[in-house]
Amino acid sequence: VSAFDWNKSGDKIAYIRFDETNVPEFSMDIMGEELYPTEQVFKYPKAGEENAKVSLHIYDLASDTSSNVAISSFNNYYIPRIKWTEENYLLSVQLMNRHQNELDLILVDASNNNSTLLLHKEKDAAYVDVNDDLTFLKNNSFIWSSEKSGWNHLYVYDKNGKNEKQLTNGEWEVTGYYGFDEKSGLIFYNSTQNGSINRDVYSVSIQGTNNKRLTTETGTNNASFSSDFSYFINTFSSSITPYVFTLNEAKTGKITREIKNNTTLSNKLKDYNMSPKEYSTISINGNDLNMYTIKPLDFDETKKYPLFMYQYSGPGSQQVANRWGGGNDYWHQMLAQEGYIIVCVDPRGTGLKGRDFKKMTQKELRKYEVEDQIAAAQALGARD
């Protein structure tokens, strides 16, 4: 995240200034190579304490002057993002209240440094997620993402923030926004349309039609597009396939070249008799929770096995995903070889299953997550 932004012609730079004078200090002992720790003191506003005073400024190269932007109607605010529009004199500013449950997108006229228009407003009973999806088109209409429907989706608005059109729709999440190609009129994004444990690259027209899946392998796909949106490099993996990198045509998704694969690793792992991850759901407290299970290779359903449950349940996180794992996977394989069943359950509060599922832990962290883990353990323990 950058606290400054140049306008399109490069003659003005907007920047954010932070005044921490009245922010209380926090000290921390740093344990190093010396016999005694060193003390680090830094500004740290705890809940209820005074925040840094944030101000917005614009520097003009031609006049070599910096001036303050008047945002008089907002007090005790955050400025999470600033971004120039297609007009050299119009700056977009995102403002949030301290509770972070309201976000205002406003326009600032750099000719007089006053906020001129409330372009868009987001409200949420819990909190508003901030991202970098905002994109201004040549006519200053803009693309925006929101959870207002209960799921994270893409919208387009005219230059006055009116005439809303929802571009993506359904009980699935847009998990990444890659950008808009003016030539083809296509928007490229990543989503869970193929199931909440999977990710694919898609395109949709600026009219919200012709939604098209561009990746074909089921698992986790992520794209990096060329600047002209002609091609993208796709990174694919699944629970059984290490990372594969390909060059794809943006319009069709067709693979034009395989850049790198992990065939050598895949062949080597065959010698280790790895137990597969089995993906499923488990009904807990009225919700179908995503779950994966790793069993011993010689699993016998007539026998009882010790159960090891692994989890991380931070807000919006995901552990049960169809992707190539890290170090924990090998640890879990070792446990399976020792006769354990390993289970991971994504409880309420984790991500990719809608706004309500993710944000229900607001102000109640450790309640629903723990309840679901306990209930899942009890349900699994009661199985024959």
Regions found by a protein language model. Give the residues of each.
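A flexible loop/linker signature enriched in serine peptidases of the S9 family
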Residues: 1, 16-53, 73-76, 95-106, ...
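Predominantly five- to eight-bladed beta-propeller fold
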Residues: 1-6, 12-68, 251-267, 319-329
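Blade-terminus and WD-like Trp-Asp/Gly-His loop motifs, strongest in beta-propeller folds
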Residues: 3-12, 81-91, 133-141, 178-185, ...
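Serine-hydrolase catalytic core recognition
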Residues: 25, 88, 222-384
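Long hydrophobic segments that form regular secondary structure
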Residues: 67, 72-75, 79-97
